[in-house]
From Swiss-Prot:
PROSITE patterns: RNASE_H_2. Manganese or magnesium. Binds 1 divalent metal ion per monomer in the absence of substrate. May bind a second metal ion after substrate binding. This is Ribonuclease HIII. One of its GO terms (cellular component) is cytoplasm. The gene is rnhC. Its cofactor is Mn(2+); Mg(2+). GO terms for molecular function: magnesium ion binding; RNA binding; RNA-DNA hybrid ribonuclease activity. Residues 80-296 form the RNase H type-2 domain. Its main location: cytoplasm. It is found in: Cytoplasm. It comes from Streptococcus thermophilus (strain ATCC BAA-491 / LMD-9).
Length: 296
């Protein structure tokens, strides 16, 4: 899924509207006044004068309205101010869900590479704890942590969110807050965890919206420094929360959702009852049922 953004005059947009009138579609975006879909490419014209083309090959349609392809950028977003967003904790039974959006400019690249910034999955926790504070101090970002207690209040059958829609909400809010703080990116990338269609479906339920298009890209943390920064800061935030929860219950809470998590969950049930899992774990995970089975 590619995205192209053009800044167009009122006259140019008027021409676009006439040319694409037969392809017009309805839009609920409060910042948009025209949308269309042509051969798999979605077009949205915003009141700001920006027009986005999004699809598998958006350059084909965009070239009809003044777009000229630029030399290919390097994967880390060379010459681009990039907002990258990533989450950590969604696959772990214990601990909260951390989402971070970060703004990285070309001027930051040398600093980030000097720290060895890379996909946090390739860094051990000790290294992450070491460099995350440096990133937090240097790089503009917004970090959100949904604690297990709050997670269990909003995620589950009959509740406001499922395990996917809650991530859409958090990514959207983190990016929204970063933009509100004055960040001016050339591109916004989220490490893909959902299809573009379903992301937009869940996004309709959110209160806060912004007109800048987002790109969902698989394994983005290994391609873009901004996403890697967010991944590292989010991992550190998740680890700090796991440490805090471990201290509160007197047990070392493991990361992940394997047999070790089942064992510790069973111990918590035995020591404190069901409420301990409500405040330390993502209760809807299968680990909860397995922990109860261990007590039989």
């Amino acid at each position: 899924m590619g995205t192209i953004v053009l800044k167009m005059t009122a006259e140019q947009i008027s021409v676009l509207q006439k040319d694409l009138a037969s392809y017009a579609t309805a839009t609920k975006n409060p910042y948009a006044f025209f949308s269309a879909k042509v051969d798999g490419t979605s077009v949205i014209a915003y009141t700001s004068g920006k027009v986005t083309f999004q699809g598998a090959k958006p350059e084909i349609l965009a070239s009809r309205f003044g777009y000229q392809a630029e030399p290919k950028q390097s994967p880390d977003g060379q010459n681009l101010a990039l907002i990258g967003s990533d989450e950590v904790g969604n696959g772990s039974y214990f601990g909260g869900l951390a989402v971070v959006a970060s703004l990285v400019t070309p001027a930051d690249h040398a600093f980030l590479k000097s720290l060895g910034v890379d996909d946090s999955k390739n860094l051990n926790d000790s290294k992450i704890r070491q460099i995350a504070p440096l990133l937090e101090e240097k790089i503009p970002h917004k970090a959100l942590l949904l604690s297990p207690r709050k997670y269990n209040e909003v995620v589950g059958d009959g509740k406001a969110h499922n395990a996917v829609s809650v991530k859409v909400a958090l990514h959207n809010q983190a990016i929204f807050l970063l933009l509100q703080s004055g960040a001016k990116p050339d591109k916004i990338v989220i490490d893909a965890f959902i299809s573009e269609k379903n992301y937009q479906k869940y996004l309709k339920n959110e209160r806060n919206h912004f007109e800048f298009p987002i790109t969902l890209e698989e394994k983005a943390e290994g391609k873009y420094l901004a996403v890697a920064v967010s991944s590292i800061i989010a991992r550190n935030l998740f680890l700090e929360n796991l440490d805090k929860l471990s201290q509160e219950v007197g047990y070392t809470l493991p990361s992940g959702a394997g047999a070790k998590s089942d064992q510790v969950a069973a111990k918590l049930l035995q020591a404190y009852g069901d409420q301990a899992l409500q405040t330390t774990a993502k209760y809807h995970f299968a680990n909860t049922k397995k922990a109860y089975q261990r007590l039989k």
